[in-house]
């Protein structure tokens, strides 16, 4: 028992004593943990602590968030792609923490300082006092301190002058692909364009815009992509690719042509004409005649055209392909057309050093002292008078010369001259060895060489027995007597004149023959002759079996003439061509036919011009294109498949059908029973009894219409040009109107009105007495002769339906254009219905019923 008590006492002492083993072990572990915590506190950065912070003397804690502790610029930078900044950025204050930085270079904390102070003590930090911050602010910062690394997409607004974000470092500030910067825009863009407006390809703006434009769309304002601006613009207009400017521009060095393809300028320019940056110099500059590499500034990117007057532009340069200049130039001695000027028209007197060395296209005018003119690179055309151009060089493909030359003994057209028109007397050494295109005039020399593809010769030749046209001559026009050995074996294009010899070989694709032939029995046109113009009497065996293009003249006994393979055109008189076959796509026939009952135009004849009397069986069933002439008894003419055009007089075409997309009809029709039901394009002439159906997309009607009560243009009529008169409607017309209106379809076009419910494009003409017209919804534009009426009363309180319930101009969908006379002041328009295009004279929007409604109510029609 005592032993048990002893064991218990030892156990209690060991367990609960002051120096017990568990207590010592716990104290030792606690001491080790305290030492570990102290060492960890000495090593770990402040950012490793949580938000609990440090315990102060008063028992409170100084709480700092992770954002305050994570400005360790290796781990706490901006991580989510700043997309867009819109607004104004000012200079940051001194005690502002930069949020977007990469690292701080040039600052090394001392070893004696706290790790926290060493990590965050930089200019603008919260851990520095005022004196340290002001002293550190003066230190320069590196380029890496001013960078966005996450692709800012767009900046729109005004940026001030910042000491923190310097101007020279702005390119580094937005480093990766800023998409667009657009300058200062006015808060409300209404009225005339401001000077600093930079848009995106403005297309069109015509007229004056109202000052107050809120929530409305009158005709004068085009919201997106205006096409054109016509009028007077402020000086500092800088756009992107302006297409056209018409008007007067004053002298201002800041707004004229930018460097992006100015197309057209028409007007008057004074002495301060600027082509590029710093182009105009107010002092005299001397320049050598041949110094092409001068420092003159000009149109750097292809100005197309200039029309006007230039007086003192000695240094004017069209260095890059100006197309055309029209006007007067007096003292442009140094005018440089060094890169492909296209055309010059006017008077030049003192241009001794005028340089057209690089492909000028055309010059028209008078030259007296241009001895050193260089046309060495493809001048196209010269028209005028030259007297002393001994050194004139057209060595590289001149296209055309028209005028008089007397002393041009050394004139060289050795490299592809295209055309020469005039008189030459002493051009013994004239060489057309390389593809001359055309010569018009008189030649007496025998040594002219046309061996290499001459295109055309027009004139008289007497002793040219050895002329060789063996290589693709294009055209010869004139008289030949002894040209027995002329070889046209290789694709001659055209011959015009008189020939008596029967040995001419046209076996290889002659294109055209114009003249008189008598005994050419063996003339072979077996391979694609294009055209014959003249008189033939005994050409019974002429073979046009292989795609002849055109025959013009008189034929009497050509019974076996075969046009079976795509003849293009025949012009002349035919009497007994009963077997003439146009079975395969003849294009055109012009002349008189009397007894051709079997004439077959079954396969796409294109055109017939002449008089036909008894062509009852004429078949135009397969896409005839055009018929021009007089028809009297053609009741069976079938235009069932897309006839394009008819020009002439028709009297009894009761069964005339243009049911499938006829394109055009020009002439007079008296009794036209069925209509042009499918997409007729154009009608020009006089119509009286209008049962014609334009139900499917008629394009155009030009002429006078009298009783068009049933005229229908329900689907996309494009244009009407003419005069329409209106008188009071009678009772029959009103009853008929009610029958039409009861169907509730906007497709009725009556005597005084044009209804085009779907995409009416244009109306040109005069419309009178249309006081009864009223607008419906969705009209985009209302402009008319209001006569100072209060248009603003037109509001949502007026119960105008969206379908047709009245007579008038109903244009509900996408009306494009109106051309005519419009009166009234358009500035006072205050509509709410997206007005498209409404025209009337006069017009009123009042709540009382219209004239037509009163007339309909008088007859019991509601």
Curated annotation (Swiss-Prot):
This is Protein PRQFV-amide. The keyword Calcium does not apply. The modification Valine amide is found at residues 86, 156, 182, 190, 198, 206, 214, 222, 230, 238, 246, 266, 307, 326, 345, 364, 383, 402, 421, 440, 458, 477, 496, 514, 533, 552, 571, 590, 609, 628, 647, 666, 684, 702, 721, 764, 819. One of its GO terms (biological process) is neuropeptide signaling pathway. Expressed abundantly in the abdominal ganglion, much less in the pedal and cerebral ganglia, and rarely in the buccal and pleural ganglia. Its main location: secreted. Keywords: Amidation, Neuropeptide, Secreted, Signal. Residues 32-68, 424-528, 549-634 are annotated as: Disordered. PRQFV-amide may act as a modulator within the feeding system as well as in other systems of Aplysia. It comes from Aplysia californica. Residues 1-20 form the signal peptide. Residues 21-79, 90-149, 160-175, 250-259, 270-300, 311-319, 330-338, 349-357, 368-376, 387-395, 406-414, 425-433, 444-451, 462-470, 481-489, 500-507, 518-526, 537-545, 556-564, 575-583, 594-602, 613-621, 632-640, 651-659, 670-677, 688-695, 706-714, 724-757, 768-812, 823-862 form a propeptide.
